[in-house]
């Protein structure tokens, strides 16, 4: 599951802030694929007004933001895989939630991907050695997925991987702003 940037007239969300408007300390924590401490009440300003989406990804940190009906899908079908934190979106009365994916699985199938390259010592990025540098035509090895229904990928955290039942339920309740690609 990832952002559908082709929704005409869509809104764009800024970085999450606390209720006084201060940016939170670590905007990247929502990409880590691990449980986090409750960040407390959050607010999300709009960087560009437009059509409200059912799911979007806020700011540079790409924190997933979902409306209440989608949050309920995750709460019911994947309670051990996610955390949901209420957020107030500028100009919206409807409740939204920050979706923190709390699981990471080492499941990229390098051989089945169109391309999968990892950071190497000669790349002069020592903290990234072994992590993925490029992944295109993403494919996962489903045998490496155990009970997880929603997770991030080790070394390549941007996509949110969801199982088929969750995808179908999200589509049934309405998931404007999301794009689903089989991996």
What positions do the PLM features span?
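Phosphate/anion-contacting hairpin/loop surfaces
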Residues: 1-183
């Amino acid at each position: 599951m990832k952002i559908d940037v082709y929704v005409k007239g869509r809104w764009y969300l800024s970085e999450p802030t606390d209720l006084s408007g201060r940016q939170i300390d670590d905007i990247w924590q929502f990409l880590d694929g691990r449980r986090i401490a409750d960040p407390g009440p959050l607010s999300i300003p709009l960087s560009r007004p437009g059509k409200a989406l059912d799911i979007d990804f806020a700011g540079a940190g790409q924190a997933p933001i979902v409306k209440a009906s989608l949050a309920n899908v995750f709460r019911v079908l994947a309670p051990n895989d996610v955390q949901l934190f209420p957020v107030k979106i500028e100009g919206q009365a409807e409740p939204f939630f920050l979706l923190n994916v709390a699981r990471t699985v080492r499941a990229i199938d390098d051989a089945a991907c169109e391309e999968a390259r990892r950071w190497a010592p000669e790349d002069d990025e020592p903290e990234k050695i072994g992590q993925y540098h490029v992944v295109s035509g993403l494919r996962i090895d489903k045998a490496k997925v155990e009970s997880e229904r929603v997770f991030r990928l080790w070394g390549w955290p941007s996509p949110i991987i969801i199982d088929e039942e969750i995808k179908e339920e999200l589509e049934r309740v309405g998931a404007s702003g999301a794009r689903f690609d089989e991996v």
